[in-house]
Amino acid sequence: MSARSIFKALVNCGFDVLTVGITKDGRWTLIQNPDTFFADGWKEVTQELGPLCYILPDPCRPGIWIDGHELEEAHNIDCSNPVITGGLDVDAVFPVLHGSFGEDGTIQGLLDLSGLPYVGSGTLASSVCMDKDTAKIILSHYGIPCVPYVRVERYEWRQKPIQVLEDLSSGLTFPVFVKPSGSGSSLGVSKVKGEEGLCRALEDAFLYDTKALIEPAQEGYLEIECAILGNNEPKASVPGQIVPSREFYDYEAKYIDENTRLIIPAALDDDLAESVKKISIEAFKATGCSGLARVDVFVNPRSRDIKVSEINTMPGFTEVSMYPKLWEASGMSYEDLVATLVDLAFERKTACHRAFRRVTKM
């Protein structure tokens, strides 16, 4: 759904857009009729939508490369045209991919090897922010307050579960949240109200990662999100508040339940809102982010305490998602936001290229 909204905005901004989808078995397909594909909402990407395509880890052969034999046999296209059998020129990539392989540094690493500019954070920042454990270690190093947690390794849990439970029970105050360290969209997250629910919650979390985090529920705190935009001098949007209709903001609440409320701007006084923006920018910089990120925090209006929960380097991006809605409330339209992100991709690529050239001359 994010891809459909971004595709429409890029076209309206005057960009020539090549649309690449990924099938469930991991094959990349150049979608030949994206207008038709996106017309009726979400659809599964299948190989029948277009020819197989590739991005090569070779800066001497940038762009999207297509298998000419596959074109000829499956789609009845004349492969005597060298443009079709070779590479299609690409100026920049907008990787609208959430979760594993999309915002964990994997696709970013491939794009770095290819030499193509791309929207969003680089390989290191993407991988750091995807792993909540690593991100919190870095944020704490810089003195940025985070939600406290206990880490559980899957191999330890498999070898000695009783010992792990005994160690945990002495230091936990329920309710707690159990979550995979490196997963998105609240997949594998459980709210646990007592010791009897820990085993099931840990098993669910370990379906998505080899590390699980256990965090105390932040009762009395508001769930606040802040959108960050920029590279070296990032700006923060007005903060927004999430009021889920469910017990917590799980996968269904994010993507299915229409009763979840987004309050923009959040019900915070001006000083507290500015503090949220300041901490969000600090978190963005500390983890080395660029382009965009949504920083999720917990705020206690009475004590004025602020704790960073996590940083999302490729947040949801439909017209009604929190990230673009926060910028809309801050005075930037959806199309201007998308165009700005493309500009930031070129800016980051130019800065990285100059730094590389300076080093090679030494």
Question: What do the predicted segments below correspond to?
Answer:
Residues 98-99, 186, 242-246, 312-326:
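Glycine-rich phosphate/pyrophosphate-binding beta-alpha loops
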Residues 117-121, 146, 236:
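Short hydrophobic/aromatic-enriched beta-strand-loop microsegments
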Residues 1-4, 8, 14-17, 83-88, ...:
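Active-site nucleotide/adenylate-binding loops and adjacent lid/helix of ATP-dependent enzymes
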Residues 1-124, 128-130, 134, 153-164, ...:
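ATP-binding N-terminal substructure of ATP-dependent carboxylate-amine bond-forming enzymes
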Residues 12, 269-362:
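ATP-dependent carboxylate activation and anion-phosphoryl transfer catalytic cores
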Residues 109-118, 194-199, 329-332:
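A glycine- and small-aliphatic-rich helix-loop capping segment at beta-alpha/alpha-beta transitions
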Residues 190-278, 301-307:
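Phosphate-binding site of ATP-dependent enzymes
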